[in-house]
């Protein structure tokens, strides 16, 4: 490898940060996302997040159904610069029904920001997504939000994170007041108080007055009881809390905690500055040839998301690719690991929600969009040089099932195309009965809203009305060993056998008890709640 390329890759990796935000619905994720973009200069004025408000639509909520409802349904990639760093923000759905899409996005992230509502603390979706981050070993940075509203005691929230998630906590800053008396935060590292002035609806950057802890001006700027409370809290923190250990942070064992209000912009820029210093840079990835460093000179990356019809004016399909190693260049040819084909990567795009601009180069940690004429599937690896493949992205066990019928025969082709594209995109899992007479697809999802999204998009983007009929199942299990293992068992009861999109057997059960009963009757049959992962997944 030439010294020039080595230096170029090293510098690019040093200046890149990549993260996803995980949260429960309504914790303020879309608002925080927009405020980070505001401070990064990517947008000049933050739009309101609720679709019904008269202001602009939120930048990251672009799909028609999202704009109608004011919630995030799909994952979006937002790229911006701050203090010379290239930041890739993988904006994940906040709605509880979309944990599977969120999981796929977390596969492309190097860090996670856990967003918590100060009034509610840890909520079910946050816990679930934390487990996914833990599984992947991601460093977790905590932002406790909505300090401009009444909430729980900060020390109580730190204790909850430690007790329930098993994470050590280190408060990087500390709130001064709460609710309508929320004045700012204290930076523990620099021993400085940041007092904020509210901007109109938080649409502009917050003005910040910074004073040292012992500065006599504090008595003029801060009410006496708030200053007294701050000093008491800091004494408690210094007495019982651990020191910040970045090695533990990078191992996912300690979380730096920040307090603020995304709505009013209080504490957002301070969080962003510290995050850039503390977060992991793009690192090694496990592949079929072992660990591969980002500075490896050959290009490689993997597909973590497919999205059809990002622009309704152009019925296009885009593959989201996480660059893992080397340098991506426009019009380069790469090997497609699953098919063995050589693919020319033309018209690469930098993604910013629905807006896209052409790019010429990209580096490890970046996410690029490639037009996808049916070439790519989720989990695919592309590379130059020596063959390598990254581990695929698994499917998780769905909990809701329904048949989907097209009552209009003249719309058969549109229906088939829509179902195929939405399945490839990961909007929903599609299964089929083993009975050839039953041709209607079976949708499998982790939440009811996924069904609504599929029906809405079939109508809105493909012009197909559909009829949905719920099925009485709540548990799905893949059969280890495939059809051969299943056929050896012979006849089984209290289950329905279907096949997934890769023609693998899946057993559907009405409840967990039926599933356990089958495993008790046939211990030789090994079942899995996660679909088997093959680096090269061939659709039959």
Curated annotation (Swiss-Prot):
It comes from the Bacteria. Belongs to the TRAFAC class translation factor GTPase superfamily. Classic translation factor GTPase family. PrfC subfamily. PROSITE patterns: G_TR_1, G_TR_2. GTP binds at residues 23-30, 91-95, 145-148. NCBIfam families: prfC, PRK00741.1, small_GTP. InterPro entries: EF-G-like_DII, EFG_III/V, G_TR_CS, P-loop_NTPase, PrfC, RF3_C, RF3_dom_3_sf, RF3_GTP-bd. It comes from Trichormus variabilis (strain ATCC 29413 / PCC 7937) (Anabaena variabilis). This is Peptide chain release factor 3. One of its GO terms (molecular function) is GTP binding. It is found in: Cytoplasm. GO terms for biological process: regulation of translational termination. Residues 14-283 form the tr-type G domain. Keywords: Cytoplasm, GTP-binding, Nucleotide-binding, Protein biosynthesis. HAMAP family: Rel_fac_3. Increases the formation of ribosomal termination complexes and stimulates activities of RF-1 and RF-2. It binds guanine nucleotides and has strong preference for UGA stop codons. It may interact directly with the ribosome. The stimulation of RF-1 and RF-2 is significantly reduced by GTP and GDP, but not by GMP. GO terms for cellular component: cytosol.
């Amino acid at each position: 490898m030439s010294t020039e390329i080595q230096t170029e890759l090293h510098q690019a990796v040093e200046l890149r940060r990549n993260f996803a935000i995980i949260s429960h619905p309504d914790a303020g994720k879309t608002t925080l996302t927009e405020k980070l973009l505001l401070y990064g200069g990517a947008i000049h004025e933050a739009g309101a997040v609720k679709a019904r408000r008269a202001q602009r639509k939120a930048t990251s909520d672009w799909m028609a159904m999202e704009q109608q409802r004011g919630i995030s349904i799909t994952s979006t990639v937002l790229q911006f610069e701050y203090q010379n760093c290239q930041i890739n923000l993988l904006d994940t759905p906040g709605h509880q029904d979309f944990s599977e899409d969120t999981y796929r996005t977390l596969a492309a992230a190097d860090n996670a920001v856990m967003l918590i509502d100060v009034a509610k603390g840890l909520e079910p979706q946050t816990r679930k997504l934390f487990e996914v981050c833990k599984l992947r070993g991601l460093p977790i940075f905590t932002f406790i939000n909505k300090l401009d509203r009444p909430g729980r005691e900060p020390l109580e929230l730190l204790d909850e994170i430690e007790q329930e998630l098993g994470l050590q906590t280190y408060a990087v800053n500390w709130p001064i007041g709460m609710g309508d008396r929320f004045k700012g935060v204290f930076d523990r590292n620099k021993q400085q108080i940041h007092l904020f002035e509210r901007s109109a609806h938080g649409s502009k950057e917050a003005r910040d007055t910074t004073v040292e802890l012992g500065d006599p001006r504090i008595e003029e700027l801060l009410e006496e009881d708030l200053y007294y409370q701050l000093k008491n809290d800091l004494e408690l923190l210094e007495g019982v809390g651990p020191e910040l250990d970045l090695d533990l942070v990078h191992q996912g064992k300690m979380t730096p905690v920040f307090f603020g209000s995304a709505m009013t912009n209080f504490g957002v820029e301070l969080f962003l500055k510290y995050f850039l210093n503390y977060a992991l840079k793009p690192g090694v990835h496990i592949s079929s040839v072992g660990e591969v460093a980002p500075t490896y000179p050959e290009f490689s990356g993997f597909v973590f998301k497919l999205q059809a019809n990002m622009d309704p004016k152009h019925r296009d399909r885009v593959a989201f690719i996480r660059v893992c190693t080397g340098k991506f260049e426009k019009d380069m040819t790469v090997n497609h690991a699953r098919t063995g084909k050589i693919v020319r990567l033309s018209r690469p795009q930098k993604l910013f929600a629905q807006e896209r601009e052409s790019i010429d180069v990209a580096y490890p940690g970046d996410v690029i969009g490639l037009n996808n004429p049916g070439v790519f599937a989720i989990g695919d690896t592309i590379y130059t040089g020596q063959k390598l493949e990254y581990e695929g992205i698994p499917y998780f066990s769905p909990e809701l099932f329904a048949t989907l019928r097209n009552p209009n025969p003249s719309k058969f082709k549109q229906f088939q195309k829509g179902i195929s594209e939405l399945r490839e995109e990961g909007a929903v899992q599609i299964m089929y009965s083993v009975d050839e007479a039953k041709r209607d697809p079976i949708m499998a999802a982790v939440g009811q809203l996924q069904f609504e999204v599929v029906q809405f998009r079939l109508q809105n983007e493909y012009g197909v009305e559909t009829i949905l009929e719920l099925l009485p199942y709540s548990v799905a299990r893949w059969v280890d060993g495939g059809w051969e293992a299943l056929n050896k068992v012979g006849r089984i009861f209290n289950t329905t056998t279907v096949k997934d999109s890769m023609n693998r057997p899946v057993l559907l059960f009405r409840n967990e008890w039926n599933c356990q009963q089958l495993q008790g009757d046939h211990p030789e049959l090994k079942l899995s709640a996660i679909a088997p992962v093959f680096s090269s997944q061939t659709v039959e």
